């Protein structure tokens, strides 16, 4: 979604995404503008058991969710949180982390973070939030910590899509 927004704004983003994004011809492109990577915590290779995402060295990180996955690689949620902590520590102090509110993500950030963090949907007026205008999230309102508001009506449905849109904004 972020790649699509950047493209529509004429920024010609580079990207590496697990599938072919809507409106694009492939799953990767070098581009001329910002570079977007869709990444997860799966290990890099049989000889490098670190999560792939620690090799990317991002300036900006969006963490939408963190849950137990990849039981073939990780023993438990704590093992995954450790990998996310390594990722968070890769972001420079001049960077930016955008993170949704969850106990699992909070635990990672509480382990140590020197990067400014914007929080999503915590219920606090100091954070970014969204409010559904219909039960399917086909219409919703976004609010910024500064009090700015914007309404979105689109053809997608589901809270997860609305949350992705909020993170992209």
Enumerate the language-model features and the residues they cover.
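Acidic, Mg2+-coordinating active-site environments of NTP-dependent enzymes
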Residues: 8-11, 23-25, 32, 36-38, ...
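Switch II of P-loop NTPase G domains
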Residues: 43-57
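Hydrophobic/aromatic ligand-binding patch that stacks against planar heteroaromatic rings
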Residues: 5, 52, 87
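A conserved segment at the C-terminal end of the G1
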Residues: 1-15
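A short hydrophobic beta-strand->loop->alpha-helix junction that borders the nucleotide-binding pocket
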Residues: 17-21
